[in-house]
Amino acid sequence: MTEYALLFVSILLVNNFVLVKFLGLCPFMGVSKKLETAIGMGMATTFVMTVGSMFSWLVNEFILVPLDILYLRTMAFILVLAVVVQFSEMFVRKVSPELYRLLGIFLPLITTNCAVLGVVLLNINLSHGFLKSTIYGFGGAAGFSLVMVLFAAIRERLAVSDIPAPFRGSSIALITAGLMSLAFMGFTGLVKF
């Protein structure tokens, strides 16, 4: 049980996909302008990464490995993720049309989010079992969501701040992301895993 908790904390804080591995930067910068949009994107990404990790592990273990077609891994995983994203898109459209409108093009683009595909490929490369893959996917998604929500809250504050003209927009956003990355480096010694 401790091993799973350490894995979760490790991927959530110490090895965060956005701030340490630099995966998922497109939605991180694009969707994080409003807090409610970032929360919605975080929830959708959490669902996709967790369920995608589970199904990708199952596809790998019960289809790709037995049939010795490992060269189709990336294509198979993208297909699995596309199905999960399509399901989540239909769900969000039905449950919250306003959130669906706010997320816009970023919801279908979860399929090509490198953090989503990255967690699936890392699960296979690290030889995680089913439970570890699920925890790794959920922890990675929780870390992605945490960073995205924190960044959106900071950007909302920056939008009403008096920032010098050369630093407005993307400049201050990148500086803020860099400072957040430095702050997360403080967690480096937290978990030795």
Swiss-Prot record:
GO CC annotations on file: plasma membrane
Transmembrane feature ranges: 5-25, 39-59, 62-82, 102-122, 134-154, 171-191
InterPro entries: Ion_transpt_RnfA/RsxA, NqrDE/RnfAE, NqrDE/RnfAE_oxidrdctase
Pfam families noted in UniProt: Rnf-Nqr
Subcellular location, record wording: Cell inner membrane
GO biological process: electron transport chain
Disulfide bridge partners, by residue number: none
Top-level enzyme category: translocase
EC number: 7.-.-.-
Keywords of this entry: Cell inner membrane, Cell membrane, Electron transport, Membrane, Translocase, Transmembrane, Transmembrane helix, Transport
Topology class, membrane: Multi-pass membrane protein
Domain of life assignment: Bacteria
Family as reported in the entry's similarity comment: Belongs to the NqrDE/RnfAE family.
Protein function: Part of a membrane-bound complex that couples electron transfer with translocation of ions across the membrane.
Subunit structure: The complex is composed of six subunits: RnfA, RnfB, RnfC, RnfD, RnfE and RnfG.
Protein known as: Ion-translocating oxidoreductase complex subunit A
